[in-house]
Amino acid sequence: IKDDTARFEHMDWRNIVYLVGYYKEGRIIPAAPPILTTEMAKHTISARPNMQKKNKMRLERKYTEAPIIIFLRDLLLDGRFQGSNSPDFKNTIDMHVITQRPPGSYLTVKLDTVYKFRYVRFLARDGIRSDISEVEFYSPSDSVNPLKGIPMGNPPVDGDNSHRMEMAFDGDPLTCYASANLNNAWVGLDFGKKTEINKIRFAPRGDDNSVREGDEYELKYLSMDGWVSLGRQTARTYFLEFSGGPDKALYLLSNLTRGREERPFTYENDTQVWW
């Protein structure tokens, strides 16, 4: 420190967020806005909250999404949720077809028709293994608890029991089913009798860092006095909506129910930009 200026040398410049601060009464107080360093010629980006302009934000994740996670979501495209009253799935009916990249967390699909089947399944498109984390079917009489049945489908990839068909119905989004087949790859349930179905809920294979329905979250932004809370919300679907956050601020979304991974971000052009 010299002439009221602090100089830091031998710093790593590879996409790292730095915050210069000082201790006061047991807290770290920012001495300057946070800085993101990039690999491009030691370029820096600073986050300075603009309190005169407020954002309405739609948030889907609390941590950056790796390319493999996006790839796993895309594996479900053109997948079909089918029903039949024959164990070999003759005369199947498509209850739902995945036509858009699904979110990283659970997606609920309310069916236009009440179907009645004994056998149901998720069938991946040809040439793709049936990698999926969770599959749930619901009846009109119980919208909370998924229907129970005997798992059925292809054997797991490489005979790996950690990816066996039961994993698609265990209620844990961090486990998954992965089929050995690359064609006609599927996993399903035998209900034991014809059963009414009016809702499907499923989750792609992922890292559980997407917004999860039923979990409580808190959004904060970094001010010159430290982190400021914008409130808490319990997720009702795979995204959260917050209003009143200052433009150009550095944000942090925390899951108060489970998980520890989180990463700061700015909100630009209606998108979370990870730091």
Briefly describe each language-model feature range.
Residues 22-34, 39-92, 101-240, 244-275:
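Aromatic, loop-rich ligand-recognition surfaces of beta-strand-rich domains
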Residues 4-6, 17-22:
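Acidic, serine/threonine- and glycine-rich low-complexity intrinsically disordered segments
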Residues 13-16, 249:
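A glycine-anchored, Pro-Gly-centered beta-turn/N-cap motif
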Residues 2-10, 234-239:
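Short, solvent-exposed S/T- and G/P-enriched segments that are highly enriched in secreted/extracellular
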